[in-house]
């Protein structure tokens, strides 16, 4: 499946839903490109739902780290939601699970931002 990212803004929080394989050949910079669009409009809170991400390689891990860095440099926050055990295992190996706040789903991540699901 070709990698896609769907975005929805809710009360100054952007929900990004990633679908497919987050790899060098498929993921490219789609997440970061959307983050740049929304941060340019003043949004600083993001939830990245990875529930439908089938696979992540080293490029995908690096892309997540770059997204985190971009958002943090602008004084924002990015939380992960719906991370599968397979993807979480990769994040743990790369120690990114210590960088991101990880939630079971979008509702829990929204609550962490103080919003109703």
Please report, for each region that a protein language model flagged, where it lies by residue.
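Short acidic-hydrophobic, aromatic-tinged amphipathic segments that line or gate anion-handling sites
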Residues: 101-105
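Conserved catalytic submotifs in the C-terminal HATPase_c
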Residues: 10, 51, 107
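Short beta-strand/loop segment at the start of cytosolic alpha/beta domains
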Residues: 1-17
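Residues at the C-termini of beta-strands that transition into short coil/loop
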Residues: 19, 106
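Short, charged, intrinsically disordered terminal tails
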Residues: 108-116
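Amphipathic alpha-helical interaction surfaces in cytosolic regulatory modules
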Residues: 22-100
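Acidic phosphotransfer microenvironment of two-component signaling modules
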Residues: 85, 107-108
């Amino acid at each position: 499946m070709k990698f896609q990212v769907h975005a929805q803004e809710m009360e100054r929080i952007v929900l990004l839903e990633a679908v497919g394989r987050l790899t060098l050949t498929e993921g490219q910079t789609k997440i970061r490109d959307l983050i740049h669009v929304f941060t340019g409009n003043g949004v600083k809170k993001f939830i990245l739902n990875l529930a439908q991400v089938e696979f992540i390689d080293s490029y995908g891990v690096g892309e997540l780290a770059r997204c985190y860095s971009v958002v943090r440099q602008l004084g924002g926050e990015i939380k992960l939601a719906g991370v599968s055990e397979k993807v979480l295992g990769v994040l743990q190996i790369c120690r990114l699970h210590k960088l991101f706040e990880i939630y079971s789903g979008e509702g829990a991540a929204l609550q962490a931002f103080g919003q109703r699901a």
